Amino acid sequence: VLSINAGHWIQGDHGHDRKDVGATIETFIETFRNTGKSKRPALILKTSGATFSTVQYNDIYKRIRNITDKYRVEIPNIYVIEGSFSTDEMNALYNHKKVKAMVSFTHGEGYGRPLAEFCITQKPVIASNWSGQKDFLTHSVKLPGSMKEVHHSAANNMILKESKWFYVDYGYASKIMKDVFK
């Protein structure tokens, strides 16, 4: 397993959710879809909501299928882990010998606790070069990108449509994922 993306996959069209999970999945697939099956990494998508619900679970799988169904070739496996984990469970996941790195394309509006926790493993972190995580991701790959207006599908009472979010350079992110996988 090359990477973990820890976060919420909530409001916002593809590529416009707070954590940019859809674009992370698509970039991962584009990066490794032509890799031989025996050498192809997998993606672990760790999500959590307020509580577990079948509706949320089905929504996550629908979002993934909306991305994966357009590919007519074999693609890397995507494993979904849903729910709240204890500190020990997250530690075991982060430190699992098959987990090689964490990837986060978050648009950046906070500290990035999962990124801070993952740093303790001393494994690579590939993350947006924006927001609170810049303070502690000193030995990680900070992805370049640009500021763009928040997409109307993500705007709500907390995220104003006049706001701007950071969008990573997906081509550069793909190159870095390949380098980390080698």
Where are these regions (language model features)?
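Short hydrophobic beta-strand element within catalytic cores of glycosyltransferases
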Residues: 124-127, 141-144
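C-terminal "capping" alpha-helix adjacent to the active site of nucleotide-linked donor transferases
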Residues: 147-182
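Acidic donor-binding loop of glycosyltransferase active sites
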Residues: 92-110, 120-123
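Short catalytic/ligand-binding loop motif for oxyanion handling, primarily in non-cytosolic enzymes
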Residues: 10-15, 51-55, 111-112, 133-136, ...
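Short alpha-helical segment that forms part of, or immediately flanks, the ligand-binding pocket
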Residues: 91, 116-123, 131-135
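Conserved catalytic-core segment of nucleotide-activated headgroup transferases in glycan assembly
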Residues: 1-89
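Nucleotide-sugar-dependent
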Residues: 15, 105-112, 134-135, 156-164
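Short glycine/proline-rich turn/loop motifs
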Residues: 5-12, 99, 153-162
